[in-house]
Amino acid sequence: MFQKKTVTIGTIGAGYAAGLHASGFQRVCGLEIRLKTICDVRLDAAEKVKDLFGYEQAISDYEEMLSDPEIDVIDIVTPPFLHCTMAIQALQAGKHVICEKPLTGYFGQKGELNVGKNTPKSVMYREVMRDMDSLKAVVESSGRKFMYAENFVYAPPVQRAAQMLRAKKSKILYMRGELSLNGSSSPLAGKWSGTGGGILMRNGCHPIGGMLWLKQQEAKARGENIRVTSVVADCGVTTDCLLPEDKRHLLVKPEDVEDYSNVTITFSDGTKALAIASDTVLGGSQNYINVYSSDSALVCNITPTNMLESYFMDDDGLENIEISQFMKHKTGWNKAWVNDEFVRGYTGELQNFMDSIAYDMIPDSGFSLAYDTARIVYA
């Protein structure tokens, strides 16, 4: 009788991303996934995730997981200022690592105020590169896998587009990607010290990562070496012009970060990619990558899609039904989520990561993509 391989998980962080990952782990096929330990400094939050998704235990000290011989992989879903330190410790303890986006950033020195307004971007870039190079050395010497949780890579339309591009050996000439929404519910989102940047750091990294990956697929299919040669960004705070009453529908509260970003990436073959992100888009999150090549046009709609369009006269009975992300009202016409964990790429992401560990495969989204994305964000 065939016995499935087992991969044992230890997760650090019990916030929103922990739920996305735990749900993805539960959907992995062909392997036994053991959710052993969930850790958070807020033990009550860890206990909630434990009870909701079936982890065996909840703890408040993540170093306990590093010494647990049963745990194969450390899943890091903490705020990004902790990513590099925790990843290095986990790799040195012989664990594989899954790291949420973004890989890292600059968060200021202790006691530093208004980091985004006062610290030169050249200083930020230098510090970020130093931290990433330190982590890179550990990744390369550890013999363990580093998996970068960029769900755009695993969104079914993006994966399907990559398959077609590889088959035709198409030359991508221009890509446009976006992740825009109505602000953030996190109190740290408006502070550079809390997130390492604004909308570009929080959300713009998604289309950047997805488009970099697609360009890598082209390069492999065509036997070419393609790198990024130029990054030009236009960022700003578009909501400064609003009176308090004009902000009543917006969640965005920037203090020393941008709420809009527009980044143009130029590759060594002269082709372009445009990444857009805004904190001021009402009507639900906008997630897509459009690819225009020498012989094709591929429109990858991630959210919203039109698989299910809903119309409700009232909200009765829908209190626990989520229509889509950042859609407060459920009445009228909406493009409702259908199996959003799969459509947005989380299911495929965790399946690929678990297969990579169990069968010693190279993950689609690994350290090089994490490194290049962060380097572009801080360029």
Regions found by a protein language model. Give the residues of each.
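Rossmann-like NAD(P)H-binding beta-loop-alpha module
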Residues: 142, 149, 155-187
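N-terminal glycine-rich "phosphate-gripper" loop used for MgATP/nucleotide binding
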Residues: 77-81
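Rossmann-like dinucleotide-binding domain that binds NAD(P)(H)
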Residues: 186-272, 277-284, 368, 372
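Beta-strand-loop-alpha-helix segment that lines the small-molecule cofactor/substrate pocket
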Residues: 73, 84-150
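C-terminal glycine/acidic-rich active-site capping loop/insertion
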Residues: 151, 240-254, 290-368
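N-terminal Rossmann-like dinucleotide-binding module
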Residues: 1-53
